[in-house]
Regions:
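Catalytic core of tubulin tyrosine ligase-like
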Residues: 2-152
Length: 153
């Protein structure tokens, strides 16, 4: 996420909220795949799409996780019960396996503030890059974000 950078407004929001965690969310576009804040087990928490129940329709959620968090460091000095997730991917036309924890699961354990951020323009907080081609196609947006000429990116 090239949009995530230190921002006094985000830090101020996090401190003012007195939450242990702040999770940044972005408006969801039709092609987006990712987690969203949902009420589960009596608490609003980030549920990644790989954890959605089989009959859940993700199109009903209008925001999703940017995978950008701010934490109060003292609240991370614990052992948290986090799930292990097995994900199959194709890398250079070969099947690869990724076994991972999801950082968003910390929202099940920590008081969390939810913050919807801009998704376009100079002040965007969310500019995801999944492939090298994404980087090339986002040249102008990156230049706008960082006040640089597009040919200098």
């Amino acid at each position: 996420n090239l949009g995530a950078r230190l921002d006094p407004l985000i830090l101020g929001h996090h401190i003012h909220s007195q939450a242990a965690a702040t999770c940044e969310l972005a408006p969801k576009w039709p092609e987006d795949v990712g987690g969203s804040p949902l009420s589960y087990l009596g608490r609003t928490q980030l549920i990644e799409q790989i954890r959605y129940p089989a009959d859940f329709d993700p199109s009903i959620v209008d925001v999703f996780n940017t995978n950008t968090f701010t934490f109060r460091a003292a609240d991370l000095d614990h052992d948290f019960e986090l799930g292990w997730y097995y994900v199959e991917k194709n890398v250079e036309e070969r099947k690869a396996v990724q076994i991972e924890h999801l950082i968003g699961e910390l929202t099940a354990h920590l008081p969390t503030s939810w913050l919807c951020v801009r998704r376009s323009g100079r002040t965007t907080r969310f500019l995801p890059m999944k492939t090298p081609d994404d980087l090339s196609s986002a040249r102008d947006e990156i230049a706008e974000m960082y006040d640089a000429p597009a040919d200098g990116v």
